[in-house]
Amino acid sequence: MSEALLNAGRQTLMLELQEASRLPERLGDDFVRAANIILHCEGKVVVSGIGKSGHIGKKIAATLASTGTPAFFVHPAEALHGDLGMIESRDVMLFISYSGGAKELDLIIPRLEDKSIALLAMTGKPTSPLGLAAKAVLDISVEREACPMHLAPTSSTVNTLMMGDALAMAVMAGSIT
């Protein structure tokens, strides 16, 4: 029994590491564009996402804030019920959605466009509605989740967290050079 548990844990870690090892090669023009948009932002970075993406988004907003970039998290449902009023034209929105097709996006994107708010996307589907609407797309796609039943986002949440850290560290480096 304990050997089976160890094997399951090791297999999870190996799959997540394998997926994460593909991230560095995805950094390119869009990553630089996203970092520059944040560096030149005169307002705040507003991070948003639903479900596990939202949980990771809260951490990304906290990392940005703790490294000198004004940032906060807003839940998409709350945004649609008045909290979009907190977002100004000088802000940037980083929306996280693995599928890039969250239904809330259909309502949020036009409002962001009306306010001329720059939209950045972190998604596993760069050609999704979110990816197509964004000024820069950070690709967090995975070939395989570590969950044996393919239900729980595992590898994809690791990739999201790592991409958020990479972005925050790049922005921090850009602000001190």
Language-model features: locations:
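Glycine-rich phosphate-binding loops that contact phosphosugars or nucleotide phosphates
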Residues: 43-172
